[in-house]
From Swiss-Prot:
Keywords: Aminoacyl-tRNA synthetase, ATP-binding, Cytoplasm, Ligase, Nucleotide-binding, Protein biosynthesis. It is an enzyme of class 6 (ligase). Residues 203-206 are annotated as: Aspartate. The gene is aspS. The record marks 35, 86 as: Important for tRNA non-discrimination. Gene3D superfamilies: Bira Bifunctional Protein, Domain 2 (3.30.930.10), GAD-like domain (3.30.1360.30), Nucleic acid-binding proteins (2.40.50.140). Belongs to the class-II aminoacyl-tRNA synthetase family. Type 1 subfamily. It comes from Psychrobacter arcticus (strain DSM 17307 / VKM B-2377 / 273-4). This is Aspartate--tRNA(Asp/Asn) ligase. PANTHER family: ASPARTATE--TRNA LIGASE, MITOCHONDRIAL (PTHR22594:SF5), ASPARTYL/LYSYL-TRNA SYNTHETASE (PTHR22594). It catalyses: tRNA(Asx) + L-aspartate + ATP = L-aspartyl-tRNA(Asx) + AMP + diphosphate.
Length: 608
């Protein structure tokens, strides 16, 4: 029991073991019901809900119960008893018992909340929920998610502690480094015109901890990125940050795979087999994504070689373009899709840059070896542009059967991958094609660099990732270089990513050169790291998990905002505190900052 001045046990933890005992509980009134002279109060705390019965035999308690309203804070003392037969609630831990009240004390009254807290089905705008987040988090679903997160985080710590990792804190105020997103800057009062940056990750500091000899490090770290927000993005987020020395790629992956297995087993009693692995090239070829959802048994099939000579520029153009791709996606049973559904999918792929969505309905594939019946066997506006040989080859290569549909993507490879990869995921979920609840995997062997639109190289992960091969090989063929990097994917979501790191000055300099970072820029931005590499840096590597994203998947939430206590909106604002906000002139003057007025566009005249 949980003894204190106020209570003996949590409401949700009162069970049959306490029958006939007198106890005190505290909490909020979840519901109040008056049934023919007997008042029922559902009392709620973080552990759950307890039914309290108040009858007229205790007139003082009855009068108090008659006056209370939802969200009043009460202390109730009474006797635990078994519920009458037929009134049990198997969905509640306390569903077989109730508390017969003797005394009720009002600890705090409540105004009527701006939205109901006892109806999970009520539709409430997210902005209103975030404005009154302290009320929103009283809802049982939010309480459960916050408790789940806390326990999962504890399980993570226990696993890492048991495996010899040390929890070491790294600075929040650091310097700006290019890691792919804009930094949040903090002005220095003591050095006017200079700024700290909030860390996008503890990357460099954890590498320095390896140089310092702390060979197994972890941290539940706050990270900050000033970027456009999506369902799985926040300006501040939490990362399970891990780094090790003297372990190879396989050993690091095994430790982190074990961590996820431990958390799922501890929290959900879910057991995983060994995670499958595929290379980045295989993932892009078969799933058009570097984070494929393997619950969905659909694969893309390359058909560019069949389309090089067709009388259809939409296909022939990309088929003959070295940077193009023509891919087919077969949907079993998809011939039943309506014109309206196909139009909706066409609109969907347009979001990703596709200029249309070609398809062939396979109504009858029974006589495919005897040629193609274009009248009844296949149905599509595009088949008139293809020979029978091409159509037969398409059906055979995709394995299409009667009543299937084949969708096509034909464009630059990047557009096809984005559009058809997303279509694969959407159709798989829309048509309920998932074959299992959880599908983890590792994706490995990422390209070291990717080319920008202006022809420069940029790091696919970050510039401290160790490449495969030698310095000479990197300098000779940077476009072919692969990194010793690995991402953990779960149900189509990247939950973690890591790599081996560069631990020699020679290789780090070569990578900077490939990225167009000259010696002076490297010294200015990363001089402290380059210096550290001169003093015996051990072979090291690590990984970071997005804690918010992992918890979101585990509890089935639709957004990480639903598993963060006080999240920001999609516009990086906090409706609760009204942050960000203006500060007074005195504070700005102390920091040597002057705010420029935004120039308002003249909207009185039409644009020319």
């Amino acid at each position: 029991m949980t003894h204190s001045e106020y209570r003996d046990e949590y409401c949700g933890a009162v069970t049959e073991s306490l029958i006939e005992q007198t106890i005190s509980v505290v909490g909020w009134v979840h519901r109040r019901r008056d049934h023919g002279g007997v008042i029922f109060l559902d009392m709620r705390d973080r552990a759950g809900i307890l039914q309290v019965v108040v009858d007229p035999d205790t007139p003082e308690a009855f009068a108090t119960a008659d006056a209370v309203r939802p969200e009043y804070v009460l202390k109730i003392t009474g006797r635990v008893r078994r519920r009458y037969e037929g009134t049990e609630n198997a969905n509640m831990t306390s569903g077989h018992i109730e508390l017969l009240a003797k005394e009720i004390e009002v600890l705090a009254k409540s105004e009527t909340p701006p939205f109901p807290l006892n109806d999970e089905k009520s539709t409430v705008s997210e902005d209103l929920r975030l404005k009154y987040r302290y009320l929103d988090m009283r809802r049982p679903q939010m309480q459960d998610r916050m408790v789940f997160r806390a326990k999962a985080t504890s399980a993570i710590r226990r696993y890492l502690d048991d495996h010899g990792f040390l929890d070491v804190e790294t600075p929040i105020l650091t310097r700006a480094t290019p890691e792919g997103a804009r930094d949040y800057l903090v002005p220095s009062r003591t050095r006017p015109g200079n700024f700290f940056a909030l860390p996008q990750s503890p990357q460099l500091f954890k590498q320095l901890l390896m140089v310092a000899g702390f060979d197994r490090y972890y941290q539940i770290a706050k990270c900050f990125r000033d970027e456009d927000l999506r369902a799985d993005r926040q300006p501040e987020f939490t990362q399970v940050d891990i780094e090790t020395s003297f372990l190879n790629e396989e050993e690091i992956m095994n430790i982190n795979e074990g961590l996820i297995k431990h958390v799922f087993k501890t929290m959900m009693d879910v057991e995983f087999e060994k995670f499958p692995r595929m290379t980045y090239a295989e993932a892009m070829r078969d799933y058009a994504s570097d984070k494929p959802d393997l619950r969905i048994p659909l694969k893309l099939i390359d058909v560019a070689d069949l389309m090089k000579d067709v009388d259809f520029k939409v296909f022939a153009g990309p088929a003959n373009d070295p940077k193009g791709r023509v891919a087919a996606l077969r949907i079993p049973g998809g011939a039943s899709l309506s014109r309206k559904q196909i139009d909706a999918y066409t609109k969907f792929v347009g979001i990703y840059g596709a200029r249309g969505l070609a398809y062939i309905k396979v109504n009858d594939a029974s006589n495919i070896n005897n040629g193609v019946d274009k009248e009844s066997g296949l149905q599509s506006p595009i088949i008139k542009n293809m020979t029978d040989d091409v159509l037969v080859s398409l059906i055979e290569r995709t394995g299409a059967e009667s009543n299937d549909i084949i969708f096509f993507g034909a464009d630059k490879a990047s557009v096809v991958n984005d559009a058809i990869g997303a279509l694969r995921q959407k159709i798989g979920l829309d048509l309920e094609m998932t074959t299992c609840e959880w599908a983890p995997l590792w994706v490995t062997d990422f390209p070291m660099f990717e080319e920008t639109e202006d022809g420069r190289w940029t790091s696919m992960h970050h510039p401290f990732t160790k490449p495969k091969g030698s310095v000479e090989e990197l300098k000779t063929n940077p476009e072919s270089a692969l990194s010793i990097a690995y991402d953990m994917v779960l149900n189509g979501t990247e939950v973690g990513g890591g790599s081996l790191r560069i631990n020699t000055l020679e290789m780090q300099t070569a990578v900077f050169e490939a990225l167009g970072i000259d010696d002076q820029e490297a010294e200015d931005k990363f001089g402290f790291l380059l210096d550290a590499l001169k003093f015996g840096a051990p072979p090291h590597g690590g990984l970071a998990f997005g804690l918010d994203r992992l918890i979101m998947l585990m509890v089935g939430a639709s957004s990480i905002r639903d598993v963060i206590a006080f999240p920001k909106t999609k516009t990086a604002e906090c409706p609760l505190t009204q942050a960000p906000a203006e500060v007074n002139t005195k504070q700005l003057r102390e920091l040597g900052i002057r705010v420029r007025e935004k120039v308002q566009a003249d909207t009185s005249k039409p644009a020319e």
